[in-house]
Amino acid sequence: MNSKSRITAIGTHVPNQILSNNDLEKMIDTNDEWIVQRTGMKERRIASEDEYSSNLAIKAVENLCTTYKKNLEDVDCIIVATTTADYVFPSVACQIQQYFNIPHTMAFDLNATCAGFTYGLHVGNSLITSGSHKKVLVVATETLSKVTDYTDRTTCILFGDGAGAILLERDENKPSFIAYHMGTNGHGGIHLYRTNLSTTMNDTPLQTNEKIVQNGREVYKWATRTVPVGIKELLHTANMKMDDIDWFIPHSANLRMIESICEKSQIPIHKTLTSVEYMGNTSSVSIPLALDLARKKGKLNNGDTLLLYGFGGGLTHLGLIVEWDLS
């Protein structure tokens, strides 16, 4: 893979409010043991009523700046991965541009659901490698609690809120990106959706309360079948073996799903980083949260080779192999 960009900084933010399994017991017919057994989740963070995806995104970028120690005025592209933008338009990316007063930049949102962060990294790397841009800010931000049906016990136990940001800069000598693999199965879109204008999909009537609707069984089957094949293809493209990978960071959809993917891909679970236990499923945000949690715990070292894999609604997926080096 011809890459000329490097990951140079990371920042994250989660809301203060915690929604525990015990809290959910008071809202729906469920219990802590049932949730942990099926998902591995104990807590998730929930945005306040007047806190939106743009607010979380801005705080994640501010957190990035505490370690980056430089200003962002020369950022020439802002990419925001989100399914829960404050508005249909303007984009969250434009709100970030306004807040940080970045003078000359392209700014747009992309919607690839839980694969949004890896999509954003891939697009950002491609823009820099092409020579059209030099510094790209990639942000993932979600307030899924605002579109979660808290009467549906199969979905409301899953989702949480948060934001993560990564900075990409042109560096031909120490590029981060090694390989990518991606794919889409639009036929499976009916299994995970949230309505907007249309009330049907491929002539099938939809639930139209604008909340997340998921056929968990079908999504599980697709992910545990598709992602292991994608990992194999990704390693083949990079001319690597799993032994060459220091850390596997999948989308933190559900711990049981991750365990199945690891088993089928022969990935030791101790080489896997997630944010699922105390953050829940934060869609596009789960991978940067897992990365930053590991960084803060001292697990990530400069020179580590990481395999990131996002997958979700669409149905769509994208995996990346990158070298981690913030030096």
UniProtKB/Swiss-Prot annotation:
GO terms for molecular function: 3-oxoacyl-[acyl-carrier-protein] synthase activity; beta-ketoacyl-acyl-carrier-protein synthase III activity. Pathway: Lipid metabolism; fatty acid biosynthesis. GO terms for cellular component: cytoplasm. It catalyses: malonyl-[ACP] + acetyl-CoA + H(+) = 3-oxobutanoyl-[ACP] + CO2 + CoA. Keywords: Acyltransferase, Cytoplasm, Fatty acid biosynthesis, Fatty acid metabolism, Lipid biosynthesis, Lipid metabolism, Multifunctional enzyme, Transferase. It is found in: Cytoplasm. The active site is at C114, H251, N281. Its main location: cytoplasm. Its EC number is 2.3.1.180. InterPro entries: ACP_syn_III_C (IPR013747), ACP_syn_III_N (IPR013751), FabH (IPR004655), Thiolase-like (IPR016039). It comes from the Bacteria. One of its GO terms (biological process) is secondary metabolite biosynthetic process. Disulfide bonds: none annotated. Residues 252-256 are annotated as: ACP-binding. Homodimer. Catalyzes the condensation reaction of fatty acid synthesis by the addition to an acyl acceptor of two carbons from malonyl-ACP. Catalyzes the first condensation reaction which initiates fatty acid synthesis and may therefore play a role in governing the total rate of fatty acid production. Possesses both acetoacetyl-ACP synthase and acetyl transacylase activities. Its substrate specificity determines the biosynthesis of branched-chain and/or straight-chain of fatty acids. Belongs to the thiolase-like superfamily. FabH family. The last Arg residue of the ACP-binding site is essential for the weak association between ACP/AcpP and FabH. This is Beta-ketoacyl-[acyl-carrier-protein] synthase III 2. The lineage of its organism: Bacteria, Bacillati, Bacillota, Bacilli, Bacillales.
